[in-house]
Every structure is written in structure tokens, then in C-alpha cells.
Amino acid sequence: MGLELYMDLLSAPCRAVYIFARKNGIPFDFQFVDLLKGHHHSKEYIEINPLRKVPSLRDGKFILSESVAILCYLCRKYSAPSHWYPPDLHMRARVDEFMAWQHTAIQVPMSKILWIKLIIPMITGEEVPTERLDKTLDEVNKNIKQFEEKFLQDKLFITGDHISLADLVALVEMMQPMGTNHNVFISSKLAEWRMRVELAIGSGLFWEAHDRLVKLPSWDCSTLDPSIKMKICEFLQKYK
């Protein structure tokens, strides 16, 4: 049994793993876990990942969850070019620092924009209160500024002159609001960094990985599993 990656490219962490594997020529079987149909709650998937999250990796009998752990595993097993996860102590620590920070500072608020502006209204027919969206946008703007000042500074990439895992993870997370046509790349510094990362990845691969996200507004939500719709309606309650 070869390497299997369980993913849905609506998920930013899945896109990071997918792009990294494709960019580095790592052979894998794509096991599609449709989040919109609740496949991550299926008995079969829970046996692979009891946390019911994506992505997951299965390499023979070895199973791994969490995108950052998966990216580091792939780096080591397949001897990826060193710029992805630099061997230099300080540069690698900088990547680790960003990875630890981004979970709550970037991933969570970026996903909230997608949920609040698109997914919840689309599925439930109910709008999330405007003040909730405004609060999330304020958080995003604050954290984007911190990203620019703390991590990017005046460098081409987070660790210097070359793309790293930190840049890849940062960009796919910041793309999440694009599912609602919300652009967070307002400043010239951030927009220029975004384009450098896209070009380093390859524009074809980059947009292939984001195709499912940008097409989300045209998704027919009548195909949604009723049990999943119920879970989302329950999820909405905390935004009221």
C-alpha cells in the first residue's frame, strides 16, 4: 500500500499538504473526504482519524493527522529541498514559530469569514449578525498587520529569500475568504508576497488546488446530508 492522503481541498490545511506533495513530486493516492457531505463523520473515516478532521495521512500501517505534522513528515521522508524546512537552527525555528502562531491567529479567523459570509447563510438561510462579521474582520486585519510586521517584515519570504512551509501554510489560509470574494491582500507588501508565493509554487498548481474553494458559491446545498445541515444549524447558534 502506497502513501494515501485523505483530503478535501475546501480545507486550507488540506490544500497546503496537496500543493506540497504535488510540487515536490511525491506520489500519493488522493482519498477524497467530502466535508460538505459529512464523510469525515463516517464510520470508515473515524477509524482512520477519530478526531474527524482532515487531512490525514496513511503510509502503510502508519497513520498521521494534523497538517503541520504531515508536512514535516513528508519533508523528512522524501528529502524535500531544504528551503521548505531549513536545517539552519534559527531559520527552522522561525518556521516553527509561525506554524505555532497561525493556528489561532490566521487559520481560525480566516475560516470564520467563509462560514459567516457564505456557508452559514447558504445552508441555513439565516444571516449572521453584522456585528459578528465586523468583529471577525477587525481580528483578521489586526492579525494580518502582525503577520507583516512580525513575520514578513521586509523580506521576500518569511525565512528570507526562499519559500518555506510557513509561506505555503500562510497563503492557503489567507485564501480561505476568497470563497466569498473577500480579499485580505490589501496592502502592497502583502499582495506582492502573495504573488511571489504563488509563482514559487506555480500558478497552475496553485489555482488547481483552490478550484473547489472558488466554485463554492455555486454549490447546490440541496445535496447536503440532513444530519450535517442540522450540525451547521446548531453551529450557527453561537453566532447569534
From Swiss-Prot:
Homodimer. Residues 1-82 form the GST N-terminal domain. Glutathione binds at H40, K53, V54, E66, S67. Its EC number is 2.5.1.18. It catalyses: RX + glutathione = an S-substituted glutathione + a halide anion + H(+). Residues 88-218 form the GST C-terminal domain. The lineage of its organism: Eukaryota, Metazoa, Chordata, Craniata, Vertebrata. Conjugation of reduced glutathione to a wide number of exogenous and endogenous hydrophobic electrophiles. InterPro entries: Glutathione-S-Trfase_C-like, Glutathione-S-Trfase_C_sf, Glutathione_S-Trfase, Glutathione_S-Trfase_N, GST_C, GST_C_Theta, GST_N_Theta, GST_Theta. One of its GO terms (molecular function) is glutathione transferase activity. GO terms for biological process: glutathione metabolic process. One of its GO terms (cellular component) is cytoplasm. This is Glutathione S-transferase theta-4. Belongs to the GST superfamily. Theta family. Pfam families: GST_C (PF00043), GST_N_3 (PF13417). It is found in: Cytoplasm. The keyword Ribosomal protein does not apply.
